[in-house]
């Protein structure tokens, strides 16, 4: 059986990679969305590890809610990105600071 420490280290590594990805890729909004999804995956990994370690089902149920919210976030985020690309011709985050009235 794999100890819970290994799962927590995996969660920390995934969270750290996503945090570095968010810091380094400030221009591309699609990469920002992917990094946020990776961050949610890291949190889910920790919830599953603690849920299995303490023999509680609550953490696993909470993961399903997080996955549902993450899927909705990804769908809405990609729809907004497609509309921005269609209207403006690029998906550069720096050029999205102008709002139309």
Swiss-Prot record:
Q: What is this protein called?
A: NADH-quinone oxidoreductase subunit K
Q: Which GO terms describe its molecular function?
A: NADH:ubiquinone reductase (non-electrogenic) activity; quinone binding
One GO process term, biological-process aspect: ATP synthesis coupled electron transport
The record, for Gene3D superfamilies, names: 1.10.287.3510
Where, subcellularly, is it found? Cell inner membrane
Give the Enzyme Commission number: 7.1.1.-
Lineage, highest ranks first: Bacteria, Pseudomonadati, Pseudomonadota, Gammaproteobacteria, Legionellales
Q: Tell me how this protein sits in the membrane.
A: Multi-pass membrane protein
Q: Looking at the record's lineage, which domain of life comes first?
A: Bacteria
Q: Which reaction does it catalyse?
A: a quinone + NADH + 5 H(+)(in) = a quinol + NAD(+) + 4 H(+)(out)
Name the keywords, alphabetized.
Cell inner membrane, Cell membrane, Membrane, NAD, Quinone, Translocase, Transmembrane, Transmembrane helix, Transport, Ubiquinone
The record's function comment reads: NDH-1 shuttles electrons from NADH, via FMN and iron-sulfur (Fe-S) centers, to quinones in the respiratory chain. The immediate electron acceptor for the enzyme in this species is believed to be ubiquinone. Couples the redox reaction to proton translocation (for every two electrons transferred, four hydrogen ions are translocated across the cytoplasmic membrane), and thus conserves the redox energy in a proton gradient.
- State the family named in the UniProt similarity comment for this chain: Belongs to the complex I subunit 4L family.
Q: Broadest EC class?
A: translocase
- Where would you find the membrane-spanning parts of this chain? 4-24, 29-49, 61-81
Binding partners and assembly: NDH-1 is composed of 14 different subunits. Subunits NuoA, H, J, K, L, M, N constitute the membrane sector of the complex.
GO CC terms in record: NADH dehydrogenase complex; plasma membrane
Q: Which gene encodes it?
A: nuoK
Q: Which HAMAP family match?
A: NDH1_NuoK
Q: InterPro entries, from UniProt?
A: NADH_UbQ_OxRdtase_chain4L/K, NUOK/Mnh_C1-like
**Chief subcellular location:** membrane
